[in-house]
């Protein structure tokens, strides 16, 4: 989104590449993602990484990925945090891979999953204003749309407002570019 050039190295979590010594020597937490700048600075946790990039590359002609307005920024950070730390049943029964690859539809969702789906939909309907969470698009919009897309790709019916929101996010140039790179590997 900011138009920064970078190199991406894929880490195979299924094969626990993040637990191998070569990755652990770069990122002591063994967490993914990890941002490495030169050989002497690494940062893990996506929220910390996006906050760092926003603050380092602000007012230099780069697009903002968070609202400038302090209230809008706080709400976006809260949304990112809840998407990252909550909705564990959704993440368990509808893993990220289901967003990219069609999986066998499971009509027998757990009761806990149904509760989480309803809570996610309520949260999204409340915080998504006309188009975005804040006045303009932010990285929190993508994080929320990614979680909502888990539902959509698993054939969960969501309100049209949320379908449109997910579609708007996934049609952004930066997201389409990321998907193209991801699909080429």
Which residue ranges define each predicted feature?
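GST-like domain detector, emphasizing the conserved glutathione-binding G-site
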Residues: 1-107
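A local structural micro-motif
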Residues: 7, 159, 177-178
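GST-like fold's C-terminal all-alpha helical module
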Residues: 83-171
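Exported/periplasmic ABC-transporter solute-binding proteins
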Residues: 181-182
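Conserved histidine-centered catalytic loops in small-molecule metabolism enzymes
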Residues: 185
């Amino acid at each position: 989104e900011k138009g920064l050039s970078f190199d991406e190295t894929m880490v195979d979590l299924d094969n626990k590449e993040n637990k191998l010594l070569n990755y652990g020597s770069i990122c002591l937490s063994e967490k993914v993602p990890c941002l490495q700048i030169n050989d002497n600075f690494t940062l893990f946790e996506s929220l910390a990484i996006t906050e760092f990039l926003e603050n380092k590359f602000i007012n230099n002609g780069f697009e903002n990925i968070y609202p400038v307005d302090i209230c809008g920024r706080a709400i976006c950070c809260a949304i990112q945090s809840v998407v990252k730390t909550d909705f564990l049943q959704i993440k368990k029964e509808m893993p990220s891979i289901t967003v990219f690859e069609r999986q066998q539809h499971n009509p027998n969702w757990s009761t806990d999953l149904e509760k989480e789906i309803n809570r996610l939909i309520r949260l999204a309907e409340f915080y998504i204003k006309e188009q975005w969470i804040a006045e303009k698009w932010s990285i929190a919009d993508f994080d929320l749309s990614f979680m909502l897309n888990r539902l959509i790709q698993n054939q969960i019916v969501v309100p049209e407002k949320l379908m449109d929101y997910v579609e708007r996010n996934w049609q952004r140039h930066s997201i389409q570019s990321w998907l193209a790179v991801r699909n080429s590997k």
